[in-house]
Amino acid sequence: MKNKIAFVAVGQAGGNIGQLFEQKGYNVLYINTSQEDLDTLEKAKFKYHIPNGEGCNKDRRKAKQLVIDDFDQIAAEIETKIKSELIFVIFASGGGTGSGAGPMLADLLIDDGKTIGAMTIIPNPEESVKSHMNSYECFSELTQIPGLASCFILDNNNGDKLELNSRFVEDFCSFLDIPEKHKSVKGNIDKAEIIETLKAHGMAVVTRQKAQESAEVIKAIHNTPVSYTHLTLP
């Protein structure tokens, strides 16, 4: 799967999750308007600083315009560094750089002919009013992007954000590893089916259940409340 799926991590929060995927062996391009934030990613292989950006300080409009102005170069970076069948854009919905640049970048890349999914983070209730306004606007834009593949949502209200990031990446990678690690004479899930699932438009849910048969797994998932997992997806 590592040659089929890659990630564009936008902003500081996106970078935190991107690093976990890179540690798993996936290609990740880190994009930020803040050079200082990029400098904290010491072991990152691919980093790109958007010109004229010195951070966006929760200003979504500024982040969107910076992406529009520099899209040709951003697209070239993606094409040369992490060309893959499916690319997920990772960003926080409540910040500035990620919240503004994430949906805009996803939309422009889809228009450019690429298959794009999203992974985004919603703020916890204690964060600022501005963060929640940004998150609302971010999701309003995400829902209007035609052709967007699956979208995963991490809810920071479900626990420590760094722990949630780690659990999410572990669960997501376990899902990607199903064709390699789980084989049965009763039937298998192959890589193409995993990719097709992730390409499907709409929100996605990742949860953990143990069972011996497929019917038991399906029943367990149906009985799992959405609030159970740190991932809540439409």
State what each model feature region is.
Residues 1-234:
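Tubulin/FtsZ superfamily GTPase core signature
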